Amino acid sequence: MAGITVAAVALPLALAFGVSSGTTAAAGLITAIVAGLIISSFSGAFYQISGPTGAMAAILISLIGKYGMNGIFIATFMAGIFLLLAGIFRLGNLISLIPSPVITGFTSGIAIIIASGQIKNFFGIEHFTGSFFDLMKFIGGLHIDYPSTIIGLLTILLMIFYPKSWGKKFPASLLAILLSTLAVLALKLNVPVVGKIPTTLIPQAHLRLTEINLQDMKTLLIPAISITVLGMTESLLCGASAGRATNHPMDNNQELVAQGIGNIFIPFFGGIPALSLIHI
């Protein structure tokens, strides 16, 4: 039953983080599946759940335009190697040295980046490539798709006011997806949709060994390090928090090994970087 509950929560999150990262909903879904199978098998704690996250989406959205999907795949592969080495050399214990205000500012910044990046989707504005500030400056003169905005607003309200006691049995995010999908179909609303989800676990867009070369690895070193640092930070902080709540401390270094193995393989399935997160 716990597995079904987690899957119900993870499905809408995987789709949402796939889109908000600048990739596709399919990439988010594939990441959740592969990460769930591989990372959980080697994890340092039974309560850790891995998949695409909001924090990683905030980084990827700035990388996808510059390096493309293949660049993301290679950076993820490199980050997986770095995470694996970090676990082997027992660097997981360094997480306790990070100041609390740094983490607070980090998570707040992620929330702002994700929210600002989804403004144009919220208003149903297509083909706008400017920055968030450009969008806010000219939004009055842009064509706003009101059905998209209304659906987005109702979804937010449902997520805010949905009773927490109900959420343990049926997640608000999953209910929002079901209701909005039914509304679009029943009313025949012309709004942008996620699109076709591949029926195969390995889509056409995925990393191939022949595409990995030294020059690309040099170019993508900094993005790979960024993914690695974020992977270490979020995964171990989530594990520390859940460990205190369950009185079962996590093996930090084993968790890094698991994250490393998972992110080495995920790009070959067409997925994006996976981290650990807490589902409550």
Model-flagged regions — what are they?
Residues 1-278:
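Transmembrane helical cores of multi-pass ion-transport proteins
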